[in-house]
UniProtKB/Swiss-Prot annotation:
Pfam families: MFS_1
Keywords: Antibiotic resistance, Antiport, Cell inner membrane, Cell membrane, Hydrogen ion transport, Ion transport, Membrane, Plasmid, Transmembrane, Transmembrane helix, Transport, Transposable element
Recorded family membership: Belongs to the major facilitator superfamily. TCR/Tet family.
Membrane topology: Multi-pass membrane protein
Keyword Acetylation: no
CC per GO annotation: plasma membrane
InterPro entries: MFS, MFS_dom, MFS_trans_sf, Multidrug-R, Sugar_transporter_CS, Tet-R_TetA/multi-R_MdtG-like
Source species: Escherichia coli
Molecular functions (GO terms): antiporter activity; xenobiotic transmembrane transporter activity
Keyword Ion transport: yes
Name of the protein in question: Tetracycline resistance protein, class A
Major subcellular location class: membrane
Length: 399
């Protein structure tokens, strides 16, 4: 076996998994309309998004610990097989409770990113790990761009079609893993430890670190604000602009591409010229302005130029992450990244519930209030930024 084949297989697994997730994004509200009253679609959509994120948050450390104990391959294969069956069940869900159970199972089986990351760490040397983790992120990003486009095209025929396609992709993933994916964890198997199963344990180390805690609060708020389009883009596009599933899929892909390009090509030059602190502030201003403009947009075409502004707002998060990384020693970088990942998962739980509730409460008067609320949340960053940026982080951030 060629030494790079396991890497290619695991990266393909990550990409196909992301495509499967993205496939159902444009059509989930349409599927809900077949099961609940139209006035209840927004509330159930938000709960389903939050439920999926909650299961990922709770189960990611569990799957990671199980892979340490029993190996990466069996955990991945069981998850992929479960996902294939789950998507097939959701495609034919006759009742709402079946769809809820399906999203719970999808969240559990979808929490395999930690296992895939551990697999890559097993098969690569230290000097190559950063590059290969970059490949992993790129493959996931590709899947999340391609998935909504394909899902939107399929959704034009039936809201059930993308679910069947996602089931088929996970089935293909499972078969590929069975025949081509060897076990990577061949060292000593670690016993299960209770603390390894606790997703909240990653926050304890930061207690008493004033600057880090302040900047992590900013990180949480920014990630929470980022949940506005994640929770509302599909429903808002349908209600305000009367988009169909195909248009929604294209818009999601366009947004993903623009956001990725902005982070890859703009963040570095802007941070180098203005400093990380100003890049962070510029990103928040661009994002908040985009939200306000989108709230008042009256035609579907207006959303596409506004996307450029929203994508430019994406430069703020990498700048903040760089500032945070400067505040901790090398031996704590892993803990920092784990804490940031946990915070991201928490916002994926809270955000959909919060913003779909605001949207549902205001839809009969004006459905732009949720975007205004998201922009207003950036104001909560100001006290934490004042404490974090001007008490030591600011001097480092502009170096």
């Amino acid at each position: 076996m060629k030494p790079n084949r396991p890497l290619i297989v695991i990266l393909s697994t990550v990409a196909l998994d992301a495509v499967g997730i993205g496939l159902i994004m444009p059509v989930l509200p349409g599927l809900l309309r077949d099961l609940v009253h139209s006035n209840d679609v927004t509330a159930h959509y938000g709960i389903l998004l939050a439920l999926y994120a909650l299961m990922q948050f709770a189960c990611a450390p569990v799957l990671g610990a199980l892979s340490d104990r029993f190996g990466r391959r069996p955990v991945l294969l069981v998850s992929l097989a479960g996902a294939a069956v789950d998507y097939a069940i959701m495609a034919t869900a006759p009742f709402l409770w079946v769809l809820y159970i399906g999203r719970i199972v999808a969240g559990i089986t979808g929490a395999t990113g930690a296992v895939a990351g551990a697999y890559i760490a097993d098969i690569t040397d230290g000097d190559e790990r950063a590059r290969h983790f970059g490949f992993m992120s790129a493959c996931f990003g590709f899947g999340m761009v391609a998935g909504p486009v394909l899902g939107g095209l399929m959704g034009g025929f039936s809201p059930h079609a993308p679910f069947f396609a996602a089931a088929a992709l996970n089935g293909l993933n499972f078969l590929t893993g069975c025949f081509l994916l060897p076990e990577s964890h061949k060292g000593e198997r670690r016993p299960l430890r209770r603390e390894a199963l606790n997703p909240l344990a990653s926050f304890r180390w930061a207690r008493g670190m004033t600057v880090v805690a302040a900047l992590m609060a900013v990180f949480f708020i920014m990630q929470l604000v980022g949940q506005v389009p994640a929770a509302l883009w599909v429903i808002f596009g349908e209600d305000r602009f009367h988009w169909d599933a195909t248009t929604i899929g294209i818009s999601l892909a366009a947004f993903g591409i623009l956001h990725s390009l902005a982070q890859a090509m703009i963040t570095g030059p802007v941070a180098a010229r203005l400093g990380e602190r100003r890049a962070l502030m510029l990103g928040m201003i661009a994002d908040g302005t985009g939200y306000i403009l989108l709230a008042f947009a009256t035609r579907g075409w207006m959303a596409f130029p506004i996307m450029v502004l929203l994508a430019s707002g994406g430069i703020g998060m990498p700048a903040l992450q760089a500032m945070l990384s400067r505040q901790v020693d090398e031996e704590r970088q892993g803990q920092l990244q784990g804490s940031l990942a946990a915070l991201t998962s928490l916002t994926s739980i809270v955000g959909p519930l919060l913003f779909t509730a605001i949207y549902a409460a205001s839809i009969t008067t004006w459905n732009g209030w949720a975007w205004i609320a998201g922009a207003a949340l950036y104001l909560l960053c100001l006290p934490a930024l004042r404490r974090g940026l001007w008490s030591g982080a600011g001097q480092r951030a502009d170096r």
